[in-house]
């Protein structure tokens, strides 16, 4: 049924259309019951796109390592001569997938280590901090994130960056809770008991 014969219609010679303009309410439009199958063929030029991977960040285009479809002329005249992109080949695509899998495995390993460290902090209980006492419950100075990091290092032999520690302001004796942001998905809560000497 897929014959590609061209069919041309002339409106004046076609018996299937009948229209009368009498200038009143009796205008009619008659169409015969025959159905025509038309095949429209366009002479539009197809856009030529190239799959490329960016070697560095390109303004208004993408980031390094991103896989994009760009126009062939843009790739040939700008991206290739400046060394900002490389044409995607099956071998390069395979290497890219392997690199993505390696990065994903590394992220998973880091997350698991953070979860294990959070479990260690839950089992330890409270860390004890002694400060010189003042009037009532007040202490001289305050307990800082660096103090907590030093205590964790001395008791658990774990190095924690002090920028990961979120502490309330501690200027009195009592029990406090600090949060350690070990990973974007893992937060550990640590109890701190502050005593006066």
From Swiss-Prot:
Keywords: Chloroplast, Plastid, Ribonucleoprotein, Ribosomal protein, RNA-binding, rRNA-binding, Transit peptide. PROSITE patterns: RIBOSOMAL_L9. It comes from the Eukaryota. GO terms for cellular component: chloroplast; chloroplast envelope; chloroplast stroma; cytosol; plastid large ribosomal subunit. One of its GO terms (molecular function) is structural constituent of ribosome. SUPFAM superfamilies: L9 N-domain-like, Ribosomal protein L9 C-domain. Belongs to the bacterial ribosomal protein bL9 family. Binds to the 23S rRNA. This is Large ribosomal subunit protein bL9c. The gene is RPL9.
